[in-house]
Amino acid sequence: MLYFLLYEQLHRYISPFRVFSYTTVRTAFASLTALFLCIALGPWLINKLREFQIGQYIREEGPKSHQKKAGTPTMGGVLIVISIVIPTLLWADLRYPYVWIALAGLLGYGWIGFLDDYAKVTKQRNLGLSGKRKLVYQFIMGFAFAASLLVMRAYGDFSTTMNIPFLKQFKPSLLMTSMMANPWTYVIGVAPFCIFVALVVVFYSNAVNLTDGLDGLAIGLMVIAAGALTVLAYAGGHAQLAQYLQLARNPRTSELTIFCGSMTGASLGFLWYNAHPAEIFMGDVGSLGLGGAMAVVAVLIKQEILLLFIGGIFVLEAFSVILQVGSYKLRHGKRIFKMAPLHHHFEALGWTESKIIARFWIAGLVLALFALTTLKLR
C-alpha cells in the first residue's frame, strides 16, 4: 500500500521517494514496522489474555520445573501474525502472487494453530485438536499450496526443478511430464511433486511447534531462520547476484524479501516478551503459522534442501520425537532420549533452561551461516 503511494504515485513529484523502488529499503522498513508493531501491541495483548484467562496448560508428563509456567498468557502468535501481515501489505508490491501465497501459508497454518489453542483453552487442558485431525488440516493446506504452484507453473511463473547444494548444474524435477500429457494419468504425474511439497510444509510447521517448549527458544531460532531466508530470497530475485551465485533467477521472489523481513522483525519483537522468563507464549497459532510460512517461502525460492540447515535445530527437535516414539513402539518401551523433544533431554541431564536456549541459538546461527556459505560453492 505504502509502496504504491510513496513510489508509484508520488516519486514523480518527490524525487527522494524513488528510494522505495529498492527492495532492500522496503525490507528494512518492513522489518522495523513489524518489530515496533509487535513491541507496541505486546502489553495490550498480554493484559487482554490475562483478562480473559487464556493461559498455558502444562502437560503432566513434562519436566516438573515447567509447572510454574502454568497460566502464562498464550496464543501470542496472533500478535506475530498481525505484525507480519500488516508490514507486508504496507511495503510489498502486491502485484506479485508469491507474496499472497506466503501470506496464505502463514494465515492458513496459523488458523489451524488457533483452532488447536482454542480447543485447549475451552477444554482447560493441554490437549487440543487430535493429532490425526490436525494432520488432516495441515495436509489439506499443503496440497492446496502444491496445487497453486502447479497453476503458476502452467502460466510460466514457477519452476518445479530443485536446487541441490554443491551440484548447481543438477536440477531434478519431481514432475513426471510424460504422464502429465495424458489427462488420465495427470494425477500420477504430479503426485510426487504434490506429496513432496505437502510433506515439507507439514514437517516444518510441526517441527517449529515441537521446538516451542522453552522460553524464547523457537522464536529466537525463527529470527535466525527468517533472516537467512531474507538473504536467499533477495539473492534469488537479484539479476547480478543470481548470475554470480549460479542461482535460478526468478524476479518474482524479490518481493518475498519483504515478507521474510517482516517475519524477522515480528519474531524479534515477540522475543522481547517471550525471552526467559516469558511473559507470553506464542501457542500453536504462532508456531504452526511460522513453521508453515518458513517452509512455503523455502519452496517458492527453491531452497528446500538448504532449509534442512537453516532450520537445522527444528529438524533435530522433530527427529528426536520421531526416533523416541519409534524406539518406544519397536523396542518394547525402550527410549533413546531421557525425554523428547531434544531440549527436554538436556533439561533432564541437568542443563539450565537459559543455557539450553543460548546454546541452541548458537548452533542454529552456525547452521544458518553454513547454509549461506554453500551459495558460493559449486
Curated annotation (Swiss-Prot):
Q: Where are the transmembrane segments?
A: 27-47, 74-94, 96-116, 135-155, 184-204, 216-236, 256-276, 280-300, 305-325, 355-375
User: Gene Ontology cellular component?
Assistant: plasma membrane
Kindly state which reaction or reactions the protein catalyses. Answer: UDP-N-acetyl-alpha-D-muramoyl-L-alanyl-gamma-D-glutamyl-meso-2,6-diaminopimeloyl-D-alanyl-D-alanine + di-trans,octa-cis-undecaprenyl phosphate = di-trans,octa-cis-undecaprenyl diphospho-N-acetyl-alpha-D-muramoyl-L-alanyl-D-glutamyl-meso-2,6-diaminopimeloyl-D-alanyl-D-alanine + UMP
Report the membrane topology from the UniProt record.
Multi-pass membrane protein
What is its cofactor? Mg(2+)
Q: Which UniProt keywords apply?
A: Cell cycle, Cell division, Cell inner membrane, Cell membrane, Cell shape, Cell wall biogenesis/degradation, Magnesium, Membrane, Metal-binding, Peptidoglycan synthesis, Transferase, Transmembrane, Transmembrane helix
Q: Spell out the molecular function terms from Gene Ontology.
A: metal ion binding; phospho-N-acetylmuramoyl-pentapeptide-transferase activity; UDP-N-acetylmuramoyl-L-alanyl-D-glutamyl-meso-2,6-diaminopimelyl-D-alanyl-D-alanine:undecaprenyl-phosphate transferase activity
* Catalytic activity, EC: 2.7.8.13
Protein family membership: Belongs to the glycosyltransferase 4 family. MraY subfamily.
Described by its record, this protein's role is as follows: Catalyzes the initial step of the lipid cycle reactions in the biosynthesis of the cell wall peptidoglycan: transfers peptidoglycan precursor phospho-MurNAc-pentapeptide from UDP-MurNAc-pentapeptide onto the lipid carrier undecaprenyl phosphate, yielding undecaprenyl-pyrophosphoryl-MurNAc-pentapeptide, known as lipid I.
Write down what this protein is called: Phospho-N-acetylmuramoyl-pentapeptide-transferase
Native organism is: Solibacter usitatus (strain Ellin6076)
